[in-house]
């Protein structure tokens, strides 16, 4: 049903008006108000927009354990390890981020105290359009999540290519995509 909500919130030419389409704020608030969903956000590079939607919608204290942004490459390397071949905006970096953050979350949250929590980690590593507008920008985003507290984690990775010619527009698009992914 989450996929249907995402698809139904896209408007195409010729679409008829449809009532009860959840707003971005409503989508984030719905997650924030679910006492069983709890997780972390790690957004490096150009994107810190996804966590912002959750903070702005209200009720985030029950959902968000931690948000972080390691913009500096040396600092990012200290947390997630060095990238040898694939660079910082890569699926390899995304995988390291998701694994590291889920491991921290699971190790810091006592399951006996939180038996009904479904944990998640959202991560992205993104480069937006450059100042000279020669490099359009792209990124990797993903989520590692549980749909049942007693089950193992599922994982989704998405590669994003930006078509906007403005860094702010790219960041906003990333925020919407990330929220819908979660």
Residue ranges and their predicted role:
Residues 10-173:
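Short alpha-helical segments enriched in small residues
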Residues 177-182:
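Non-catalytic propeptide/linker segments at domain boundaries
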Residues 1-7:
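Short, Lys/Arg-enriched N-terminal segments with co-localized hydrophobic residues
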């Amino acid at each position: 049903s989450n996929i249907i909500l995402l698809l139904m919130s896209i408007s195409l030419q010729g679409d008829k008006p449809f009532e009860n389409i959840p707003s971005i704020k409503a989508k984030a608030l719905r997650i924030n108000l679910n006492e069983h969903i709890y997780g972390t956000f790690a957004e490096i590079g150009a994107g810190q927009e996804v966590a912002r939607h959750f903070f702005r919608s209200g009720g985030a204290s029950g959902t968000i354990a931690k948000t972080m942004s390691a913009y500096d490459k040396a600092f990012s390397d200290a947390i997630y390890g060095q990238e040898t071949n694939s660079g910082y905006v890569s699926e390899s970096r995304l995988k390291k981020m998701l694994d590291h953050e889920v491991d921290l979350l699971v190790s810091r949250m006592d399951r006996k105290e939180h038996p009904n929590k479904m944990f998640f980690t959202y991560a992205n590593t993104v480069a937006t359009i450059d100042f000279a507008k020669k490099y359009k920008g792209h990124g990797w985003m993903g989520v590692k999540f549980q749909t049942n507290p007693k089950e193992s984690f599922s994982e989704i990775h998405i590669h994003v290519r930006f078509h906007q010619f403005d860094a702010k527009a790219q960041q906003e698009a990333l925020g919407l995509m990330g929220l819908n992914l979660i």
